């Protein structure tokens, strides 16, 4: 039973990443619980709630409009019960401004990044209740010339 649940959650994960790549915010919202908790690299505190997670995701696309996760196939995909873990190549170009850790805006660098991106997701009833996102933030910032 858990295996079937894990496999169906993995398929939902793939459709979530498809929605990310297409900026299909309706599907993106459907894949997350209303009170989802999301941790990104560099955050002091997790993002709470789908509305806040969607808002930060839309902002990310303003900075990196061509960003893309390669999820067909994933480099790694693991599903067990209510949990999925995926590793994908993640790339994009900084063509929009970005808010720095000090709150100041960083001008577009027009430089590309390419890092591995790992998502660990906890699923309940077909929605992510907790999502942990991992990628080499320092490497990304160095590649776009911010560090």
Regions found by a protein language model. Give the residues of each.
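C-terminal and inter-domain tail/linker signature
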Residues: 1-147
């Amino acid at each position: 039973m858990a295996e079937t649940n894990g496999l169906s959650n993995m398929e939902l994960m793939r459709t979530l990443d498809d929605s990310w790549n297409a900026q299909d915010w309706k599907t993106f919202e459907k894949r997350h619980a209303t009170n989802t908790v999301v941790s990104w690299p560099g955050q002091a505190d997790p993002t709470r709630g789908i509305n806040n997670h969607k808002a930060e995701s839309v902002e990310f696309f303003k900075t990196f409009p061509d960003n893309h996760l390669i999820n067909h196939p994933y480099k790694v995909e693991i599903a067990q019960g209510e949990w999925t873990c995926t590793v994908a190549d993640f790339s994009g170009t900084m063509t929009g401004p970005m808010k720095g850790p000090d709150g100041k805006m960083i001008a577009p660098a027009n430089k590309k990044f390419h890092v591995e991106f790992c998502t660990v997701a906890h699923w309940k009833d077909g929605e992510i209740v907790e999502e942990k996102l991992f990628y080499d933030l320092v490497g990304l910032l160095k590649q776009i010339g911010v560090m």
